[in-house]
Swiss-Prot record:
Family the entry assigns: Belongs to the RNase PH family.
One function term, GO molecular function aspect: 3'-5'-RNA exonuclease activity
Pfam families linked: RNase_PH (PF01138), RNase_PH_C (PF03725)
Main EC class the enzyme belongs to: transferase
Keywords: Nucleotidyltransferase, RNA-binding, rRNA processing, Transferase, tRNA processing, tRNA-binding
SUPFAM superfamilies the record matches: Ribonuclease PH domain 2-like, Ribosomal protein S5 domain 2-like
Name the record gives this protein: Ribonuclease PH
Function: Phosphorolytic 3'-5' exoribonuclease that plays an important role in tRNA 3'-end maturation. Removes nucleotide residues following the 3'-CCA terminus of tRNAs; can also add nucleotides to the ends of RNA molecules by using nucleoside diphosphates as substrates, but this may not be physiologically important. Probably plays a role in initiation of 16S rRNA degradation (leading to ribosome degradation) during starvation.
EC numbers, comma separated: 2.7.7.56
Disulfide bridge positions per record: none
Residues bound to phosphate: R86, G124, T125, R126
Parts of the chain that traverse the membrane: none
Amino acid sequence: MRPTGRSAQQVRPLKLTRHYTKHAEGSVLVEFGDTKVLCNATVEEGVPRFLKGQGQGWVTAEYGMLPRATHSRNAREAAKGKQGGRTLEIQRLIARSLRAAIDLKVLGEYTITLDCDVLQADGGTRTASITGACVALADALNQMVANGKLKKNPMKGMVAAVSVGIVNGEALCDLEYVEDSAAETDMNVVMTEDGRMIEVQGTAEGEPFSHEELLSLLALARGGIETIVQAQKAALID
């Protein structure tokens, strides 16, 4: 029995609140159970130096956790003077995932930055960030079209992510913290809305996993992501 009584295939209650802050071109509060992440999209003219003159845009991301997002206070990374390796890895993952959602040539020479700030962490913060940031990105692009900055929307489709893992020998979808901390295998999967894979991060924390278990986890992730994409699309209609 899982802590909240979910089935092995079931994702946590998912809520996507759009227009959460008023200044950002796209702003979404994403909630997976007790994990809550604020995702803001900012549109700026111009691109990084390595892309200048190529007629294409760029999507990047930053990720951080509030000091009391977890059970005990963690000092702000700004106070330490540098970002940690985990933070850098996660924000690069978010950016790579979202670049797969749009046609950068159609975007033109604009940069969109997704700021993902974890308000409360209970497992799956990176996957929640990708899911919420994709909706914020969609809102920002829709606004650019409405404002005449873009003639065509460069969005190719939704991108979503979920964690899966093996806990006490059972494959589970969308791990909360107590499950994640006890997992023998932990995996983060990012997919397009039509089920193509963008990224798979899998680690055997205890026992190595078999090829069959890998396929089982990927199938579990795909089912969870299908549910998440439906929620993303429903949120964008509201």
